[in-house]
């Protein structure tokens, strides 16, 4: 599963890198490549209505809640079906694109992608490898201003993806100085 989160869709730097990486991986392994472009097919941002729908027991959901949950379920099933995840991740104002945050909000579902235990939450989507192609205009990896890496690693681990490799392309907007 290749996930593009650039505002510029497939023409964004992170999307281009992710596409090249995913195509190479698919050619090497013979895997089928599925692409989710969050710019062209954005996931709705989380609302109180959607959040409530996710928490409502199945038998008690009204039609709107069923529709909201079905959208989330489709995203989760797409991820569950993937053996490998390739995420194109541009940095905007030191963080992740809001479209990616919205996507993550639809993936984080108690009892579906994680469960609570006495020892804390346990992710339910394990057994996958994730590659994160992170593009930045400046140089941020390993500094206090790199809030992306910790956030994305934490979220992916939360839902069970613990085998995560970050590949950085930095300094893409630096001038000659």
Q: What is the predicted function of each stretch?
A:
Residues 1-89, 94-105, 109:
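N-terminal beta1-alpha1-beta2 submodule of the flavodoxin-like/Rossmannoid cofactor-binding fold
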Residues 116-159:
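Short, glycine-/small-residue-rich phosphate/pyrophosphate-handling segment
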Residues 107-113, 155:
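Gly/Ser/Thr-rich active-site loops/lids in small-molecule metabolic enzymes
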Residues 5, 135, 169:
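Cofactor-binding loop segments of dinucleotide-utilizing enzymes, especially the Rossmann-like FAD-
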């Amino acid at each position: 599963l290749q996930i593009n989160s650039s505002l510029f869709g497939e023409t964004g730097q992170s999307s281009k890198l992710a596409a090249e990486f995913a195509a190479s991986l698919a050619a090497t392994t013979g895997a089928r490549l599925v692409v989710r472009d969050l710019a062209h097919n954005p996931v709705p941002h989380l609302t109180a209505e959607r959040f409530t729908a996710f928490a409502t027991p199945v038998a008690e959901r009204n039609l709107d809640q069923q529709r909201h949950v079905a959208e989330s379920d489709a995203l989760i099933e797409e991820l569950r079906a993937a053996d490998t995840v390739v995420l194109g991740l541009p940095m905007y104002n030191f963080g992740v694109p809001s479209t990616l945050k919205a996507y993550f909000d639809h993936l984080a579902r108690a009892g579906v992608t994680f469960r609570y235990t006495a020892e804390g939450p346990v992710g339910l989507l394990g057994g996958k490898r994730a590659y994160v192609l992170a593009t930045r205009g400046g140089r941020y990896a390993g500094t206090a201003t790199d809030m992306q890496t910790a956030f994305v690693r934490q979220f992916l681990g939360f839902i069970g993806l613990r085998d995560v490799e970050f590949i950085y392309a930095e300094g893409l907007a630096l001038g000659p100085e």
